Amino acid sequence: MNLFDFFRGRQKQTSASVAKERLQIIVAHERGQRSEPDYLPALQKELLEVIRKYVNIGSDDVHIELENQGSCSILELNITLPDR
C-alpha cells in the first residue's frame, strides 16, 4: 500500500459482489423467518376433513399455529364452530 492508495480509500465493490452480498442477507433473513414445518398445511387439510365429518365448517374456520418455546413446540388449533 502506498501513500496514494491511502488517500483514495478503499476500492469500490463491483455491482455483482454487492448484489451477491444483498442476496445472501435476504436468504438468511427468509430462513430465519421460516418457522412453519412443511407438514403443517397438510395437517390442517386433514384435520379440516375430519372435522367436516361432524360439523359443517369452512376452511377459514380452522387456524393452526406452531410456536417454539425453547425445547418445546406448541401446536395450537382454533376452530370457529357455527351457531346451532
Swiss-Prot record:
Keyword Cell cycle: yes
Pfam families per record: MinE (PF03776)
Protein family (similarity comment): Belongs to the MinE family.
Protein name: Cell division topological specificity factor
Entry's Gene Ontology BP terms: cell division; regulation of division septum assembly
Protein keywords: Cell cycle, Cell division
Domain of life according to the entry: Bacteria
Keyword RNA-binding: no
Organism of this sequence: Pseudomonas putida (strain W619)
Function text: Prevents the cell division inhibition by proteins MinC and MinD at internal division sites while permitting inhibition at polar sites. This ensures cell division at the proper site by restricting the formation of a division septum at the midpoint of the long axis of the cell.
